[in-house]
Amino acid sequence: YGTTAMVPTTLTSTNEELMTTFTVYRKAKEMNINGSQFIGLHLEGPYFSPKQCGAQDPNFLKKPQAEEYNAILEASKDIIRWSVAPELEGALALGQTLQQHHILPSIAHTDAIYEEVEKAFTAGYTHVTHLYSAMSSVTRKNAFRYAGVVEAAYLIEDMTVEIIADGIHLPKPLLQFVYKFKGVDKTALCTDAMRGAGMPDGESILG
């Protein structure tokens, strides 16, 4: 399908399942001879907004706690990106910690407003995962309108974005809009494919 690099991505789950993922990733990377290059792990959650959980299991959503995420970082050196809702209590401190570990803090599954994204950007959140998917746009509270994550992604010039470029998650006009206003140098394309991709019709497991 033309995918040149693969970043296996987790879903919200128990910490025990996460540790299993770390072990499986290392084994799969050793066995991967002819496929897309494995370039690291992407942790998607569990620090997400319940209002924007999307396909994530809401039962496992939580706020960042230093003791927990430091243990996770200690358990795997393969993590290259961690997607978080930056408005959550403790998220900015997590972003700074990730930077110290040379891990990209990214914004996802979030109900943040523009001002919160600005603060997050200074704390290291310089990337948006799956732009437009499960994140805030313009909202209205008490008769006032607030710009959201989508608007912040465009207005913060050095913010990079990732879009699911399968032609289904985003229609062609939005893909063109992202390309026009963020440009090729600040836009990453991903498949967001799960294990059923390329398989015959039938049941498959997500995660």
Region locations from a protein language model:
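Short helix-capping segments at alpha-helix termini
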Residues: 30-36, 75, 100-101, 182-183
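Active-site-adjacent C-terminal substructures of enzyme catalytic domains
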Residues: 116-207
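Active-site glycine- and acidic-residue-rich loops that bind
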Residues: 14-20, 87-89, 102-114, 164-181, ...
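Extended, charged catalytic domains and RNA/DNA-binding interfaces, predominantly
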Residues: 71, 79-139
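Divalent metal-dependent hydrolysis catalytic cores, especially in the metallo-beta-lactamase
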Residues: 1-20, 36-49, 76-87, 103-106, ...
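Surface-exposed amphipathic alpha-helices with a cationic face
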Residues: 26-29, 95-102, 179
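Charged helix-capping and loop-helix junction motifs
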Residues: 21-24, 65-67, 142-149
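Conserved phosphate-binding/catalytic loop of the ribokinase/pfkB sugar-kinase fold
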Residues: 49-74
